């Protein structure tokens, strides 16, 4: 998921500051290159070919809580294995049982990502494109854009702003802005990347008017099949006063998923 998913993260390792030390971090001589290098290493953390997970999504709005559960299947494809399929299948509550989202994410700006949703009540497959990518994902604080798993390094410009300690955790502070031609609702994102697990700890998203519209917190992280993985995410929209929490479980890598899972025709099976 762009947003929606546990596979969005990766790797950059520098010498860690000693706990309690008064040592000062070295100056960043080229923050643009350092930011890009960080993004490249982050992109390399997930070495799996495919994955499976189960999740519960709790949507909190106006004092009411709406809960949904789903399963996610993901697989890399393409000649270099850098593109990605994702299939999200909802099973609870009953009114969304059988709803499916299928995403084909491509590296680079040359080809737009493909996204469809299957609505069982209507026996209908709808293509999600244009402004509908910015609409809410299943009434949550995530958008359809956010659930696209793949974030191509070369679709953004980067700036390593420095280092910061967040709740006792040492982080790199990385800003990224979309390159011309990338279809997105966000003007920039600021990410706090943990030095120990090298996953994002937090991310702030800004709209085209440079207003803070979304805050993401990656509060629980676990090593699964040798890969550091986010297993809980909280998404807040400060202006709306709402938030969504996703808890992942039973996550497995390299399970041998067939391409047949991700065929367009499979949505109505």
Task: Describe these PLM feature segments.
Residues 19-30:
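Bacterial Sec-dependent signal peptides at the C-terminal "C-region" and cleavage site
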Residues 10-20:
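Bacterial N-terminal signal peptides
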Residues 1-12:
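Bacterial N-terminal signal peptides that target proteins for export
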Residues 39-40, 69-76, 100-105, 162, ...:
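Hydrophobic/aromatic beta-strand elements that line small-molecule binding cavities or substrate pockets
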Residues 33-35, 67, 148-160, 210-215:
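A short, amphipathic edge element
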Residues 77-84, 162-170, 224-225:
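Short, ordered beta-strand-loop transition motifs
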Residues 30-121:
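N-terminal mature ectodomain segment of secretory-pathway/periplasmic proteins
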Residues 91, 114-118, 124-129, 135-151, ...:
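Gly/Pro-enriched, hydrophobic low-complexity segments
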């Amino acid at each position: 998921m762009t947003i929606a998913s546990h596979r969005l993260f990766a790797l950059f390792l520098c010498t860690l500051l000693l706990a309690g030390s008064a040592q000062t971090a070295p100056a960043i001589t080229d923050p643009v290159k350092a930011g890009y290098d960080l993004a490249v290493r982050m992109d390399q953390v997930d070495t799996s070919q495919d994955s499976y997970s189960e999740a519960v999504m709790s949507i909190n709005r106006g004092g009411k809580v709406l809960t949904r559960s789903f399963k996610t299947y993901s697989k890399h494809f393409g000649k270099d294995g850098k593109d990605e399929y994702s299939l999200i299948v909802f099973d609870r509550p009953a009114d969304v049982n059988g709803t499916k989202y299928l995403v084909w994410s491509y590296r680079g700006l040359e080809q737009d990502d493909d996204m469809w949703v299957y609505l069982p009540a209507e026996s209908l497959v709808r293509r999600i494109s244009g402004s509908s990518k910015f609409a809410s994902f299943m009434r949550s604080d995530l958008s359809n854009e956010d659930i696209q798993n793949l974030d191509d390094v070369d679709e953004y410009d980067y700036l390593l702003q420095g280092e910061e300690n967040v709740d006792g955790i040492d982080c790199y502070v990385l800003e990224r802005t979309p390159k011309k031609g990338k279809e997105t609702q966000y003007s920039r994102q600021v990410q706090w990347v943990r030095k120990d697990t090298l996953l994002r700890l937090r991310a702030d998203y800004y709209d085209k008017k440079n207003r803070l519209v979304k805050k993401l917190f990656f509060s629980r992280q676990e090593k699964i099949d040798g890969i550091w993985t986010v297993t809980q995410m909280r998404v807040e929209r400060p202006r709306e006063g709402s938030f969504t929490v996703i808890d992942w479980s039973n996550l497995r890598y390299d399970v041998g998923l067939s391409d047949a899972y991700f065929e367009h025709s499979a949505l109505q099976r």
